[in-house]
């Protein structure tokens, strides 16, 4: 049987090679030598597409392409470069959907924030990701594809990675897409993959208590970041609908369980919102909740989202709140905001580009004009142009 014939008869629904095991790849090319599957897997993690896998026979590369396979199901649509050195990546999925990532350089190694869902069902008042609700979960290969694409784009290799740390804090709730996130964690940390230790990975959750306990029981060693944002149940319910299901007490109990099982210190994310959660009473309650528990509070000033009605506190007010915590002996820091000049907060860039593309579609429909086709370039403080015209009939705007 020829490679083409074998592929035509294969169950190839996913059509993405990235993250498949050598056994899974071998099943796609059953007549290939055993080493071919290992080569293909290595090429995928190196950010190579099928035509660039030159040590694989031309016949098999053609067979893969004709069967509709790609190495990475994610393409870089645009790149925005910020004055602070960070970069906002806009990724397009094969079905046309968009998600975001942020590349953040640090002295201790660059971090990449990736998305786990298109949109989000959590509906947090201060987050642009959930304004349109959940569109769909990302497949594990699409989460992995963001890391591989940026690592290659930033000049990294498998052995000398540009991406040192990964943060699951982009669009979506990771624990609402648990199975795909678990497979992603296994693949991104695999010795024959990117080999990023789970200790270099942070997972941020809005507070799905059952998911936190499941993650702890899985043997995970990732750093757990919990979006707290208010120490009071009634106030938290106003800005985070998930609080209607899980109380602050249940959430802190789950955090303590995660620490007990994994030995990993838990981070509480706390977005400072003017007049909402920056009072003396909030600081005192945070001290009470975290007393005697190895954890850390990560403060960040709100990135304002249009239409939310929520305001960002002044820098001196944020500093004062931090001082209150420190004076009470609470482990806390005020985190730097990355990419403020390039819509760096969750969902802001995706929302803006969807609006731009929708407006362009309407204009094109009105004038009968075709979409434009341009090469992707990086522009400081601004956007690159789309790499290609995409069939927007498959693009979900919700």
Regions found by a protein language model. Give the residues of each.
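Auxiliary Fe-S-binding modules of radical SAM enzymes
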Residues: 1-97, 256-265, 272-398
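Canonical Radical SAM [4Fe-4S] cluster-binding loop centered on the CxxxCxxC motif
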Residues: 105-149
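Exposed loop/turn and edge beta-strand positions of beta-sandwich/beta-sheet ligand-binding modules
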Residues: 85, 110, 162
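Conserved AdoMet/S-adenosylmethionine-binding subsite of the radical SAM
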Residues: 151-330
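Short linear Ser/Thr-Pro motifs
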Residues: 81-82, 115-116, 129, 204, ...
């Amino acid at each position: 049987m020829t490679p083409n014939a074998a592929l035509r008869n294969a169950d190839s629904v996913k059509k993405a090679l990235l993250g498949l095991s050598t056994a899974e790849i071998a099943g796609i090319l059953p007549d290939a030598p055993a080493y071919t599957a290992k080569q293909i897997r290595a090429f995928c993690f190196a950010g190579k597409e099928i035509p660039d896998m030159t040590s694989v026979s031309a016949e098999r590369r053609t067979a893969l392409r004709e069967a509709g396979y790609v190495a990475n199901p994610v393409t870089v649509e645009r790149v925005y470069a910020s004055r602070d050195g960070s970069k906002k990546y806009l990724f397009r999925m094969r079905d046309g959907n968009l998600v975001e990532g942020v590349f953040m350089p640090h002295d201790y190694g660059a971090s990449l924030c990736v998305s786990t869902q298109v949109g989000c069902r959590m509906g947090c008042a201060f987050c642009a990701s959930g304004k349109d609700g959940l569109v769909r979960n990302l497949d594990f290969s699409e989460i992995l594809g963001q890391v591989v694409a940026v690592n290659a784009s930033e000049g990294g290799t498998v052995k000398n990675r540009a991406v040192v740390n990964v943060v699951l804090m982009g669009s979506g709730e990771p624990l609402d897409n648990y199975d795909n996130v678990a497979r992603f964690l296994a693949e991104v940390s695999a010795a024959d993959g990117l080999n990023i230790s789970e200790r270099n990975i942070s997972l941020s959750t809005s507070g799905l208590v059952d998911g936190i306990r499941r993650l702890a029981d899985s043997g995970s060693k990732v750093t757990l970041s919990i979006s707290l944002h208010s120490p009071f149940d009634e106030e938290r319910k106003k800005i985070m609908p998930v609080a209607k299901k899980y109380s602050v007490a249940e959430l802190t109990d789950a955090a303590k369980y995660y620490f007990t099982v994994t030995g990993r210190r838990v981070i509480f994310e706390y977005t400072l919102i003017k007049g909402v959660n920056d009072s003396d009473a909030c600081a005192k309650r945070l001290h009470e909740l975290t007393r005697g528990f190895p954890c850390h509070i990560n403060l960040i000033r709100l990135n304002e989202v249009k239409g939310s009605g929520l305001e960002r506190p002044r820098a001196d007010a944020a500093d004062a709140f931090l001082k209150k915590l420190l004076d009470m002996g609470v482990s806390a820091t005020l985190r730097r905001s990355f990419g403020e000049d390039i819509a760096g907060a969750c969902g802001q860039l995706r929302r803006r580009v969807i609006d731009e593309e929708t407006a362009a579609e309407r204009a094109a429909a009105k004038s009968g004009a075709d979409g434009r086709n341009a090469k992707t370039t990086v522009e400081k403080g601004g956007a690159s142009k789309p790499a290609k015209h995409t069939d927007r009939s498959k693009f979900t705007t919700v």
